[in-house]
Amino acid sequence: MIQAQNVCKEFDGTGVLRGVSITYLPGQANLIIGKSGSGKTVMLKILAGLLQPDSGTLLFEGQDISTLTHRERIAIQRQTGMLFQGGALFDSMTVEQNVMFPLQLHTHQRDRAARLRAAECLERVDLPKAGHLYPSDLSGGMRKRVAIARAIALEPKYLFCDEPNSGLDPQTSLLIDRLIHGITHEFGITTVVNTHDMNSVLEIGDQVTFLYEGRAEWSGTGQEVLTANNQLLESFVFATPLAQRLRAHM
């Protein structure tokens, strides 16, 4: 479980996060939505340890990370998987080598053990025969699946996904959504997804938090988003074509 309590962050004197408090539960896909500039990417980076908050508290399994030693923080980082917006694969490495990379970096596994684990992860994302290929050989959706395989290689307790459907067609986006959701539930991972995709909200939103101008304005399930009694959320949600079509049939 991850708890953010009154988290604040400023850039050049401008408040980007203004007292955000959210609890993220294991085994759930926790989505952050909001307009550009709402603070959702900054919030995700703070949760993932890529940025430090100016004030507020972050608790991982009840432990305040600001009180942890360097070694204890490294231990949490090793339990964390990150799925970057572009996939961030190493083009000079094969698919297998990409998935093996965090294993060799953090656990110093021998090649045989790392290859076996990489094969398991590629099997889980339905790419069992792609290990010898290079990222340039892959479609956008396949690259995202390889990135997911790499993110789960260390069997993380926490998974942070930044716009995982960016640049994908609707059918591939649905596949990625269901893959993330399935892995989250299967392994009991605390997953946080930053997205603007309403399909994702409705498909996998176990918990959805709506940020507006750096504040957490609303929280509920993906299905509750469409009927929420919140004018700010409503103006954001029903500006999307999908939500407009759904509202027409409600």
Residue spans of the language-model regions?
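Helix-to-loop junction immediately C-terminal to a conserved catalytic motif
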Residues: 48
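Conserved ABC transporter NBD signature motif
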Residues: 56-64
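Conserved ABC ATPase "signature" region
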Residues: 64, 111-129
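Conserved ABC ATPase signature
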Residues: 134-138, 142
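A short, proline-enriched helix->beta-strand linker immediately N-terminal to the Walker B motif
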Residues: 153-157
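Catalytic Walker B motif of ABC-type/P-loop ATPase nucleotide-binding domains
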Residues: 159-162
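Helix N-cap at the start of a conserved alpha-helix in ABC-type nucleotide-binding domains
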Residues: 170-172
